Amino acid sequence: MIKFNCSQLTRLKAVLIISACSVNFFSTATTMPAPVTNNAVAQVKVNNHWFLLSFSGLGKMKDYQDVHNHTYVYDVSKSQWRERSSVPIKHPINGLIGRLASVATALDDVAYVFGGYTVAQDHSEVSVPDVYAYHVLEDKFQALAPMPVPVDDSIALPYNNRYIYLVSGWHNDGNINLVQLYDSKTNQWQQASPFPGKAVFGHAGGIVGNILLICDGVRVDVHLNKGRSYAAESACYRGEINPLMPSKISWYKVKHPTGKSRYRMAAKGLIDSTSKSKEIVFIGGSHNPYNYNGMGYNGEPSIPSSEIWRYNLATNKWQITHSKTATMDHRGLLELNGELVTLGGMADKQQVLKRINHY
């Protein structure tokens, strides 16, 4: 068992308040029920117990038949994984129920799962409009108002314990620059101020208070007299939500930490429990954008990155470090008592992981 003592850690707490104390969190022998990547992840706290959640994704064979809708739940207090009810789909697409590139987040003790896309044998992909609330103790999915514009490979950011922002992403045939705002109190959608950069998919971002930061992803380039192509987009945009009108976001561009894009990073907004500094952290990903099997659009195998970027919201400055763990193909970053983790993902040589990754 790995034991963490608060006095020995640089303690971070997420926007969701997490207590700082000596506690055993993870067993090194604990593995997920199955290898999974491109899975939506979230964490919820119910009755003072933390749960880590994985929704849908891709199995170890990495083909269309390995796209699934499984739900895996990790009970932190018991150091135990369980497979639970599968993520529903209102209207199966050509009989397909599994999906990739869904996104998830949490408000209070409820997780929210958005979209994703199905993959057919002929490689056709369809964005799913479904939205579900997941209640972990009851193991129950509750259907909610569908997305006005179905997206996958997007970002879901929670705000004020009520709203969730879906920023950009892919819709069926191309990227969109929309910021779709879901109100959990009214179960209604509205459009927020659009994303100011090039529309992307596979980007990453986090939020602290009313400040959010979005970085990188993949854009679509259109060419003269030939087909369009995918290209890495290295750009970061900071947004400030108007607390009196949450649909209004003031956007501006910030300096990129390296000038080199990373695709499908894990990211999260954090507050340092000692210094109270606020930052957005980006971990892993790959410099080479790729198809869902981990092979680059350029035909070369994509390699995971060990880079960690930390953006300080007060100073507007970046800190770049490296992790001992290089992973990619993530949809979110989780945090417990100072430790940053991802669930599954891909390692070198496109290996689909069956573990909790520690950074």
Tell me the role of every PLM-derived stretch.
Residues 2-15:
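Bacterial N-terminal signal peptides that target proteins for export
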Residues 13-24:
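Bacterial N-terminal signal peptides
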